[in-house]
């Protein structure tokens, strides 16, 4: 009987040991499964976040490109408007300055005579012909005779044989138009021509100064 009892006890021990080993293996498998599941979940979350971030970046890039595409014409329009307004302001300032200068010249007989003499002398020197007809503007008609004589005397050594004849008056404001006798040469020495010359010469310089000041 004792031997049977000992065998039973040994069997129980073996069963318990097997059960314990099975439980440990089961717990290990469950733990590994839980860890694997946790790992899968974490990887899934990371992938989802990566996809979400990538999608978000893609959307941001798309919106940014769309915004840039929509803003580009507006920026160009604003730039053109700014340039146009700058030119208009400069043009207005030039006009005011020129108007003041013209008023000063026309309001003073000495200035008118000086302008006429310098313009006539410059034109006579610029033309190759020595036989010239001087057509005065309406504002210079009353003094052109004296000025022509003075300029002819002053330039007689520079252009031997110089002959200046006063022609019919023109509708311009001040100054003269000089034409060679054969009609092949002409020189516009009017106040209007001088204004245009000054405007074309000064405007680029003013634009450059304004651009430098804003830079």
UniProtKB/Swiss-Prot annotation:
Alphabetical UniProt keywords: ATP synthesis, Cell membrane, Hydrogen ion transport, Ion transport, Membrane, Transport
Keyword 4Fe-4S appears in the UniProt entry: no
Bilayer topology term: Peripheral membrane protein
Cytoplasm is among the record's keywords: no
GO cellular component: plasma membrane; proton-transporting two-sector ATPase complex, catalytic domain
InterPro entries, per database record: ATPase_E_C, ATPase_V1_Esu
Subcellular location: Cell membrane
One Pfam family per UniProt: vATP-synt_E
Superkingdom classification of source: Archaea
Molecular function as annotated in GO: ATP binding; proton-transporting ATP synthase activity, rotational mechanism; proton-transporting ATPase activity, rotational mechanism
GO biological process: proton motive force-driven plasma membrane ATP synthesis
Quaternary structure and partners: Has multiple subunits with at least A(3), B(3), C, D, E, F, H, I and proteolipid K(x).
The protein's role, per its UniProt record: Component of the A-type ATP synthase that produces ATP from ADP in the presence of a proton gradient across the membrane.
Similarity field: Belongs to the V-ATPase E subunit family.
Protein name: A-type ATP synthase subunit E
Classification lineage: Archaea, Thermoproteota, Thermoprotei, Thermofilales, Thermofilaceae
Name of the encoding gene: atpE
């Amino acid at each position: 009987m004792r031997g049977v009892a000992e065998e039973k006890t040994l069997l129980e021990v073996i069963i318990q040991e097997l059960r314990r080993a099975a439980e440990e293996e089961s717990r290990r498998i469950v733990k590994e499964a839980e860890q694997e599941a946790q790992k899968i979940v974490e990887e899934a979350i990371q992938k989802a976040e990566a996809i979400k971030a990538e999608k978000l970046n893609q959307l941001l890039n798309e919106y940014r490109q769309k915004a840039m595409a929509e803003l580009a014409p507006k920026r160009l329009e604003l730039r053109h408007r700014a340039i146009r307004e700058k030119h208009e302001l400069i043009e207005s300032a030039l006009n005011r300055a020129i108007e003041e200068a013209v008023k000063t010249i026309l309001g003073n007989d000495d200035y008118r005579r000086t302008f006429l003499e310098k313009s006539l002398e410059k034109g006579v020197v610029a033309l190759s012909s020595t036989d010239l007809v001087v057509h005065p503007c309406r504002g210079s008609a009353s003094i052109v005779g004296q000025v022509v004589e003075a300029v002819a005397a002053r330039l007689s050594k520079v252009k031997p044989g110089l002959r200046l004849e006063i022609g019919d008056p023109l509708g311009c404001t001040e100054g003269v138009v000089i034409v060679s006798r054969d009609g092949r040469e002409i020189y516009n020495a009017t106040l209007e021509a001088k204004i245009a010359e000054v405007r074309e010469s000064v405007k680029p310089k003013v634009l450059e100064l304004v651009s430098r000041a804003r830079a």
